[in-house]
A protein has these predicted regions:
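Nucleotide and nucleotide-moiety/phosphate-recognizing core
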Residues: 2-123, 155-163
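Short beta-strand-to-turn element immediately C-terminal to the catalytic PLP-Schiff-base lysine
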Residues: 17-19, 128-130, 172-173
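Conserved nucleotide-sugar donor-binding
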Residues: 124-136
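Conserved alpha/beta core of the MobA/IspD/sugar-nucleotide pyrophosphorylase nucleotidyltransferase superfamily
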Residues: 139-175
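Short, glycine/charged-rich beta-strand-loop motifs at protein surfaces that mediate ligand recognition
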Residues: 91, 134-141
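A residue-level structural signature of the nucleotidyltransferase/glycosyltransferase Rossmann-like core
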Residues: 92, 126-128, 170
Length: 175
């Protein structure tokens, strides 16, 4: 779960928003959606993470979400039992476990192991990717684009998972 940003448009690091309720909600969505391990990538703010989740620090968090994604995938890569990564963001408070579970199931059912939530016509999170994609995603994850360059380059492999019946998928950039 990517939560390293400064939240400059929001006015504070979003990992601290609503006294940590967004963090709790995002971690609960991942646990409830079927993740066996939850890694929270921190940067601008150092805070406790919910019980059972693991905190990882992205030292280059100022570079953008790409740095956070690289840190999270590096941490996941150390687990030989991790076959998939479900990438979720802290600033999506209305995305819950049902959306995570739906995208995980879709990724597991595809040969490519790539699936992404869509809310109407808009791509969103979570994004689920099989381990075989992690190194290439990390190489292309720069700035605030995160996995987008890789997902665009491999668009034909990404399963679109409609989740607009479950959430808006809208990120919260302002208060």
């Amino acid at each position: 779960m990517l939560a390293a940003g400064q939240g400059s448009r929001y006015g504070m690091p979003k990992v601290l928003a609503d006294r940590g309720a967004w963090l709790e909600s995002a971690v609960a969505a991942l646990w409830g959606g079927g993740c066996s391990r939850v890694i929270v990538v921190l940067g601008a703010a150092d805070t406790a993470v919910p019980d059972g989740a693991e905190a990882v620090y992205a030292p280059d968090w100022r570079e953008g979400v790409g740095a956070s994604l690289r840190a999270g995938l590096a941490a996941a890569s150390g687990d030989p039992d991790a076959d998939y990564a479900a990438v979720h963001l802290v600033d999506l408070p209305d995305v819950h476990a049902d959306a995570v579970a739906r995208v995980i199931a879709a990724a597991a059912a595809t040969e490519s192991g790539l699936a992404r939530a869509f809310y109407g016509a808009d791509p969103g999170h979570p994004v689920v990717m099989a381990r075989g994609h992690w190194a290439a995603v990390s190489r292309t994850a720069t700035g605030d684009l995160g996995a987008l360059p890789y997902l665009r380059e491999h668009a034909g492999l990404v399963r679109r998972v409609d989740c607009d019946d479950l959430a808006t998928g809208a990120d919260r950039d302002t208060r």
